[in-house]
Structure formats: C-alpha cells, structure tokens
Amino acid sequence: YSPSNPVTRAQMATFLWRAAGEPAPMGAHGFTDIPPNSYYETAVTWLIEQHITSGTSPGKYSPSNPVTRAQMATFLWRSNCPPAPPISALAVGGSHSCAIKEDRTVSCSGRNTSGQLGNGTANQSLSPTPVTGLADVTTISAGLQTSCAVKSDGTAACWGYNASGQLGDGTLTQRLTPTPVAELTDVTAISAGTDHSCALSQSGTVSCWGANGNGQLGDNTLDGISTPKPVPGLSDVTAISVGDRFSCALTSGGTVFCWGYNVFGHLGNGTTDQKLTPAPVSGLSGVTAISAGAQHACAVKSDTTAVCWGDNSGRLGNGIIDRSSTPTAVSGLDNVKTISAGVKQSCAVKLDGTAVCWGSNAYGQVGDGTNEDRLTPQPVSGLTHADTIGTGSFHSCALKQDDTAVCWGANYNGQFGDGTNTSRLTPTPVFNV
C-alpha cells in the first residue's frame, strides 16, 4: 500500500471520485496536462464539475504535484460541504452582482457605496447578502450603482444610487433597501443603466425614468423624471436593454430601435447624432436578443450569428478597433444563444453551452486565462453547460445549466460573491458561500 508515500493531485482526485461512488461527469475538464484516457481523467473532470478544484493555473491541473495539507483540507471540505443553493437568474452590474435564488428571493455581493446590494447598509460584501424584504422575484437587473427587480405580481422595485431619479420612486433619495417603482403594475422585464432605467409591460409597451440629458428616456424631451414615463411610438416590444445614456428595444417582428446618446454611433443608425425618440437600427432584422453596453450594443440574429455596433477597441469583435455606427458581424461567431455587452467587453453563450468573450481584457474579463485584449471572440476557459451570461464594468459571469454560477475578471469589491476579493483570469465558482 506504501502508506508513507506522498499523495499526488491525480491520486487525490481519484480517491474523492471513488468515495463519491464514481459518478459519471457531464462535460470536459479543459486542462491541457491531463492525458486522454488516463486513470484519473474522469475523476478530475468530476472534480471540476463539483467545483472542488479549478486547477493550479489557467489550463493546468498539475496531476503529478504532491497534495499539500492545505489542499487536502480544501478538497475534503469542498467535497463534503453542502452544494450551492440553486440560482434561477444572475445579473451583473458595474462592480456588484445579484442572483435570484430558487425560493425567488435575491442576494447580492460586491460594491455597495450607494446601497446597490439592498441589504440596508452601504458596506461592501464579499459574500452574497440577502436583499431586504424582497420576495417572489421573477427577473432582475443590475446597473452601474443600482439594482432593480420585477415581482410575480407585475410590480417592480429598485434600490441604490438615485441622484437622477433612476429608482423611479418619485424622489432623488438614495435607497439602501428596495423601494417600489411608482405606477408600474404589469411589468415583465426591467433594465437598469448608468443613470436611468426602463421597464417592459405585458402589453409590449416601454416606460423609462431617470436622467434624460441625451434623450435616453425616448419621450422627445431632455427633461429627466423620477417616475416612469411611456416611450411614445413603441409597441409589440419583447425585450429591452439599457446602457450608458441610451436605450434599445427589440420588437416581435425582429427589428431593433435605440435612442439617446450616440457620439460613438451606438444607436446603430449610421449617424452620431443623439435621438430623443426611438430610431431603427440600420439594416437589422430577424433579431432574437439584444444587449446594450456602456457605449456599444450587440444583437443575436435568427440565423444564430451576432452583430455589434458603436465604440470598439475590440468590443465589436470584428477584428479591428474602429468604431461602427451600423451593425457589423462578430467575426467567426455562429450558433449563438444569447449575448451580453459590457463596458468594454462582450460575451456570448453558444447553443452547445460553451461561451466566448472579446474586447478589453485588462482585468481578465474575457476569461481566456490572459490579460491580452481580444479583437475577436475567444473561448472562455473551461466553461461548459453555460445557459446565460452577463458582463459588468470589469467582470463577467455565467449561469450554468445546473443552476450554479461562475465569474471571472475583476473581483476587487467581492462582486463574485465567493468570499474573497481575488480577481480571476478564468471562471471560478461564485455565490457558493
């Protein structure tokens, strides 16, 4: 038996896997130093799926390395601790993140200087903290310093920064806990941006509120308002997305309208002129999903390809850095399920459950194990079985098909919710403490 011999990481993986009953893993491990068909390959794959280990460095498991006492303790604790509570939806904000749990309550983590975590304090939290008094939530959105949620009865609530009235409660008062959005009773979706918010009604109409210095409320004025105001001329809307001082809407016919700030061409109408009312995105039809970032936007088409427009520096994914005021195809990307535009990065989930990201990567928000900016889509390292994806200022997160979540990029404020403020170049399990 060789009881005095040191235990390798390969052997430890095998011990744990066999102790669990040799379960069959669903996906792939993503490591380059695991020989195919090795005695420990299945065990390591299972460890990855159970979030017991993420390797020693990007793409490396180091199977021959001895297991330290610290690693042994961590392996055993993670293999025996209760699983993370299921997550039904994930929202990624500027430097915070929020999740809807199986019981339809909400928890948030990360930066909290304006109360965007909704827990009654202004203290940041490295671990998920429950949003006070919020239940029966169906959908959620995280903005730069605000958060908003829709409840099953069609009402909405927001919390956090409110200097422009973006919480929609008729005041400019910052809120540390959820406050009802005035006058809304039939909401199906909500989107929080930098200084304004918009909501979609069951009837397919849109209302917006907050700052309006660039026409982002779409009401043909530049007057801000702290309660919801209908966007005229929009009907049959199926999805909305709010960015930095601009808004976009997708209609049932597959067309997209955007309005507001446009200095980078991110309204997609071929100009850089701001629009006070919704304007169609040029040459775009057959759209199934949209996402508005800080100064760019992206869409998924019915043929499962993706396009982006606006400011670039890599975030359009077309291989160049020049901005575009009309939609441009994301290079080499097809079989797209959903897409998310962040501040300077974009990410997409493919139909096979893998994910890709592109754009600025200074904080590792592309998730490819490097800090190199990417002008075209790059696979997110080791991520399989992804369902949805979200992008913030400098971090990105994905909700997986097993209702667990992973994040990568900047974590200085604890926005991962993993109990640390350690940033990551590749996905790490989150909202699990």
Report each predicted region and the residues it spans:
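Feature responds to low-complexity, polar/acidic, surface-exposed segments characteristic
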Residues: Y1-A43, S54-R69, R78-A84
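An edge-strand/N-cap motif at the start of beta-rich repeat modules
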Residues: S4, L76-G115, N119-A122, P128-T129, ...
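Phosphate/pyrophosphate-binding loop motifs in nucleotide- or prenyl diphosphate-using proteins
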Residues: H51
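Residue-level recognition of a conserved intra-blade site in WD40 beta-propeller repeats
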Residues: V92, I100, T139-A142, V150, ...
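Conserved core positions of repeat-based scaffolds
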Residues: H96-A99, C108, T146-A149, C158, ...
